[in-house]
Amino acid sequence: MNENFMKEKPVFPLLVSMALPMVISMLVNSLYNIVDSFFVAQISEDAMTALSLVYPVQNFVNAVAIGFGIGLNAVISYYLGAGDKKAAGCAATQGLALTMLHAVILTIGSLLVIERFLRMFSSSETVINLGVRYSRIIFLFTIAIMANLYFEKVFQAVGRMKVTMTGMMIGCIVNIILDPLIIFGIGPFPRLGIEGAALATGIGQVTPVVIYWIIYKIRPISVKIRPEYLKEGKNLVGRLYAIGVPAILNLALPSLLISALNGILAVYSQSYVVVLGIYYKLQTFIYLTANGIVQGMRPIIGFNYGAGEHKRVRKIYEITLIMCAVIMLIGTGICLAIPEQLIGLFSSNPETIRLGGQALTRISAGFLISAVSITSSGALEGLGKGGSSLIISLCRNVIVILPAAYLLSHLGGGVFVWHAFWITEVISAAISLVVYRRAVRR
């Protein structure tokens, strides 16, 4: 397959053609997140709390997989743009070996720490028991999760977005179908409760791996995975981690943020912890859609950067920013229009619904301006400037928001914590523009 279309096709149609499959995939994936949480919420509010507390650890596992995949994607795209397909293949082969190593380490580590982690944020034995039961199954599928994301990034790097869309959508649909069947024991299926939710998720991750492997075999791509490249491509390991580690930290920071916010909010009420968990499920519908656009942008911007098309790189950034802003504006409108109805999908507790409605109206004030940070961070990753991207994520997830949340909680209680989100987005957007411009000028 000839990837030169990434520097020859007009930018807007190219970006739409690359991003649209990912946006559709992300929308389906977001729907899965919401549906999955909806079914877990039907078990009990304790089950929803357990899921919320396990989420940061799950997010960390995903962060390692996606972050390393972003580094892999950037390196492959760069070498394809430079016309060096062998180096791209070496990167892909090294990436697969390292992905499997990461999976083994994270499986063992997650299973060892999860109970102690849960006890840091809850004294309820019911919640802890539910969280451990869920975790013991979900983390056994870590190798499938990481293999899934590895192949996704490789196919994206060569512009095969429809393949990744197909894999993601089928996996999500399988998950959505299995959720009610094995959570509640419908028909011949056993009633597994919260373990059923974990099993459905795991099977949903295995499915696209099988699809990707079959497509890789029957419709070969220009990037080859070969055993001999393990030896030849050793010099690329450092480059993969140079981009991948900052990207991993970028994506892992929300885990730290959620855990820290859980600690701040738990002082006031367990309902605040539930609301935070629900918010992060809902916001995936908006942010994953914007991330779909950014994923479509990364291989294009990396390819053009490798090909020396710097004016085109700037245009790609600007159009991506506008597209992300439109998505965030739509998300803001929805959250302001029906905040309590959205929270009501996951809880019947009047206090949780009331607090959740307040949270959504306050947090959504920062959605639109966050498009600047999202686009800048993604563009920098695509350009191979992971360190600069990390600065933006540190501002959004640690440096600004945690002190703001802590101070605001002491000024006005748990409800004031939600203001920290939009304040952070405004400050981070300004920092993002400065960081991006300086990084690109170097």
Labelled PLM ranges:
Residues M1-A19, I76-I143, F189-V245, I301-G366, ...:
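Short alpha-helical transmembrane segments in multi-pass integral membrane proteins
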Residues E8, F12-L31, V35, V57-V64, ...:
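Residue-level signal for short hydrophobic patches within transmembrane helices
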Residues S17-D36, I137, G171, G204-P208, ...:
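Transmembrane helical elements of multi-pass membrane transporters/channels
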Residues L27, L31-T49, L118-E125, L181-L192, ...:
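Helix-terminus/linker motif at the lipid-water interface of multi-pass membrane proteins
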Residues M48-I108, I145-T164, N262, V275-P339, ...:
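Small-residue-rich hydrophobic transmembrane alpha-helices
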Residues F60-A63, T107, N175-P180, V209-W213, ...:
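Hydrophobic transmembrane alpha-helices of multi-pass small-molecule transporters
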Residues G69, N73, I138-Q156, T164-C172, ...:
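Short runs within selected transmembrane alpha-helices of multi-pass transporters and secretion channels
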Residues S110, K153, D179, I183, ...:
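Structural signal for membrane-spanning alpha-helices in multi-pass inner-membrane proteins
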